[in-house]
Swiss-Prot record:
Entry similarity comment: Belongs to the RRM elav family.
Tissue specificity comment: Brain; neural-specific. Expressed in the hippocampus.
Organism: Mus musculus (Mouse)
Complexes and interactors: Interacts with IGF2BP1. Interacts with MAP1B light chain LC1.
Protein name, entry field: ELAV-like protein 2
Region (Disordered) location: 1-36
Purpose of the protein: RNA-binding protein that binds to the 3' untranslated region (3'UTR) of target mRNAs. Seems to recognize a GAAA motif. Can bind to its own 3'UTR, the FOS 3'UTR and the ID 3'UTR.
UniProt induction comment: Up-regulated after memory training in radial arm maze experiments.
Amino acid sequence: METQLSNGPTCNNTANGPTTVNNNCSSPVDSGNTEDSKTNLIVNYLPQNMTQEELKSLFGSIGEIESCKLVRDKITGQSLGYGFVNYIDPKDAEKAINTLNGLRLQTKTIKVSYARPSSASIRDANLYVSGLPKTMTQKELEQLFSQYGRIITSRILVDQVTGISRGVGFIRFDKRIEAEEAIKGLNGQKPPGATEPITVKFANNPSQKTNQAILSQLYQSPNRRYPGPLAQQAQRFRLDNLLNMAYGVKSRFSPMTIDGMTSLAGINIPGHPGTGWCIFVYNLAPDADESILWQMFGPFGAVTNVKVIRDFNTNKCKGFGFVTMTNYDEAAMAIASLNGYRLGDRVLQVSFKTNKTHKA
């Protein structure tokens, strides 16, 4: 007989992953007490489209990195939403936790903590879940599974065109034994809102080659975050108007901010794909550093690089810096939102980098 399930215990802030609440709803990774963990960090809840180079750039702004790894699904090659950063100096690792833990990047709030040494008990804890109600959210999926242990990452696959759930998801637990308990408790059961029982099994079971082939096909054409040339041209037309309005309102600022912005034609922005869109940020305070730029621009989209220009003698910020973003729409929205933004006692001037922009 099918059993109707109720949601398990809920966790605070589950939209971005479980936080320390109780034994069932705690941080994805325990803070390490061993000496070898004082430089090695685990970073949870990374944006799905964030690359290893972007992860390295973000944490490299804190201090010198010995190694950096974005963890990917062995079958699909897709990011699992977490990675590891190992610093050379333990002080930099501690600073990274204090500075970047809780940083909002796109729609995610990342969690940075000390990593534990790897062991067999925490490997192969990734579950494949099918038959989910199309209306089930990622938060509800986590609530359903959180009663069995600590969830590191979760994901629901959506149709690339409609954005509607495919009814398929993944849950990665902290330990394999927790994943085993979830299979025992939920496989063949009917969660709230479901008309059919769900299937819960290990995602990387070698005996399930057919399912692996299906998963690979699902990811052959990853969900493209960035539009093609024709779509991008149409979006530029819409955003040009937004930018013109933004710069018209803020015309009281330096002419450098407005020069060349009445139309985006003729702006000297790196043109070939992959280089990104370079943004000029002016009127930064002398004590400004790269982490400030990450915190400001991260919520708008994928940031590949940030750079604060410093005085060679004093190592203080010279008042300006640069941010590179991969997507035009996101870069333009960041400019429209942050130009004229008051940071401390300074009003920032933010624009696309032009020929007349200060050089590093």
